[in-house]
């Protein structure tokens, strides 16, 4: 009497299928664990480097986003696609703001340059008020943010009279500095041409009130990035910085910038 053996073959086939399924699960878990470990390491490294670059405490909170793609797959090519970092309460001299940093094409080789680096610092109206000494040569009654301008107001003494004056000041970026230039002036409710006011009989007083001054932002930031533009947007002063050929292993991230003397 013969005995058929199909059942053991099915069991062996089923065993191979189970083994392959287990192997796939193990590989997936390994990738997930490896990906998580890689992201944790990269996030910590980025945090530490930026804390040093911006002069922050070692435990200063940051939101680091390494993008949606597999970090391990990107690392295999030698370049990370993109990194976005948000940092609150970054000191910029007299100012404090929120910095949003964007970098693309970040090489794993620290001797190679990053593709692009762009940072945006957002400073609210309360902090802008700390720039009073750079906006005018007299004590100011108020500092507010207007339609693309920083609006200042003061009361000045002229011929034994107290005269209310105000000015709309336009901030611009120049050689790593915030430069403040008056666009319009109102004296006792009347709009006066800036040139006429400074060249008139009250010229010396007007010049003191309107004197264009500058605030060096570069000295508080890594020399790798430069102040590119500035604008007043709603209730914030927005500073945009950009960096070209930034080498992660070079001194440009550990040294501060400078402004013309």
Residue ranges of each PLM-predicted region?
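Hydrophobic membrane-targeting and insertion signals
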Residues: 1-70, 74-76, 252-261
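Secondary-structure transition/turn motif
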Residues: 155-158, 182-191, 240-250
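Hydrophobic residues embedded in beta-strands of well-ordered beta-sheets
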Residues: 150, 176-178, 237
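Extracytoplasmic/luminal low-complexity segments enriched in Pro/Gly and acidic/polar residues
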Residues: 197-261
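A structural signal for short hydrophobic beta-strand segments in well-ordered beta-sheet cores
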Residues: 143, 169-171, 229-230
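Short helix-loop boundary/capping segments
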Residues: 167-201
């Amino acid at each position: 009497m013969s005995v058929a053996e199909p059942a053991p073959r099915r069991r062996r086939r089923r065993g191979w299928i189970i083994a392959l399924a287990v192997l796939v699960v193990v590989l997936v878990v390994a990738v997930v664990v490896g990906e998580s470990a890689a992201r944790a390491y990269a996030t910590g490294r980025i945090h530490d480097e930026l804390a040093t670059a911006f002069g922050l405490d070692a435990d200063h909170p940051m939101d680091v986003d390494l993008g949606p793609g597999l970090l391990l797959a990107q690392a295999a090519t030698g370049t990370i696609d993109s990194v976005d970092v948000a940092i609150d309460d970054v000191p910029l001299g007299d100012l404090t703001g929120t910095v949003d940093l964007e970098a693309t094409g970040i090489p794993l080789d620290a001797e190679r340059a990053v593709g692009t680096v762009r940072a945006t610092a957002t400073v609210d109206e309360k902090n802008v008020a700390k720039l009073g000494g750079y906006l005018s040569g007299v004590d100011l009654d108020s500092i507010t943010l207007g339609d693309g301008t920083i609006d200042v107001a003061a009361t000045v003494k002229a011929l034994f009279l107290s005269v209310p004056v105000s000015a709309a000041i336009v901030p611009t970026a120049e050689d790593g500095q915030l430069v403040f230039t008056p666009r319009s002036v109102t004296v006792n409710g009347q709009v006066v041409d800036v040139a006429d006011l400074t060249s008139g009989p009250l010229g010396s007083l007007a010049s003191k009130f309107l004197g264009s001054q500058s605030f060096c932002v570069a000295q508080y930031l890594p020399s790798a990035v430069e102040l590119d533009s500035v604008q007043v947007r709603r209730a914030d002063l927005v500073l945009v910085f950009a960096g070209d050929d930034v080498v992660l292993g070079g001194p440009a991230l550990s040294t501060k910038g400078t402004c013309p003397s």
